[in-house]
Amino acid sequence: AAAARIIEETFPELLEENGGMREDGKAEESEGKQGNGEMPESEGKQGNREKPEILPVVNESGEVIGRAERKEVHQKGLWHPVVHCWMYAKQDDQIWFYFQKRSEIKDDFPGYYDIGSTGHVADQETAQEAVMREAEEEMGIRVEKDRLHYLGTVKEEMDINGCNDREIAQVYLYHLDIPFFAPGEEVSEVIAVSKEELEKKELENAPYIQGHSLCGEPVFLRAKEWCCHEGEYQKLVMPFFAERGIG
């Protein structure tokens, strides 16, 4: 049923092992709001770090050619590495993807829905290390390496109000055994979307799709409420499932 309590009914063992779910299925939201959908001018994720955040700078082939402060990287449009981690769980014949709703404290795209976890690769950090760190910071998941699949790379470019964001994303897919989340302060909510509904958005350009909160309530997700990762699902995620005959 559309309003089924996905976590409670589909994964009852989750509640048994973790003592139940919060009624609202959310992490507590931090007070105050920052940002308006513009690229961040802050040095770190929340703009309050004592030291500037240093990022590796790469060429268009992804080779590291230097390092620079995050602010400089965005202002000058320097290519830099990031990670995207799609998350899914499988129950019977149904595949569910899990997406985050970005907190209102985020400098860029607050309140938008996005891939399970995303983030910059830090200086002297590998992409796999970055994926594992971001998944734990944002979604409260300790990644098991044997469930983490590397899919490939995509390039993304955005020019917003004078800031140029040029990223080379290392894309991963993580198979959740039991979809239990403990979102950090940068994530206000986790949403479950069936593969069927997701493909209405990705393949048919549907104006909205239906997802569910973690306590099973239906949520209608408009296309304009999503961060844009155009073609990533079709290019990298779909082939993974097709090659393995999943879903």
Question: PLM features: what roles do these ranges have?
Answer:
Residues 49-92:
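Acidic, metal-coordinating catalytic segment for phosphate/diphosphate chemistry
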Residues 72-83, 93-133, 137:
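Conserved Nudix-box catalytic region and its N-terminal flanking loop in Nudix hydrolases
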Residues 142-152:
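A short coil-to-beta-strand element that immediately follows conserved catalytic motifs
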Residues 30-48:
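Long, intrinsically disordered low-complexity tandem-repeat segments
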Residues 136-140, 157:
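Internal, conserved structured core segments that host functional sites
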Residues 53, 81-83, 117, 150, ...:
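Residues that flank catalytic or metal-binding motifs in active/ligand-binding sites
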Residues 4, 8-22, 111, 152-159, ...:
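Nudix hydrolase/Nudix homology domain
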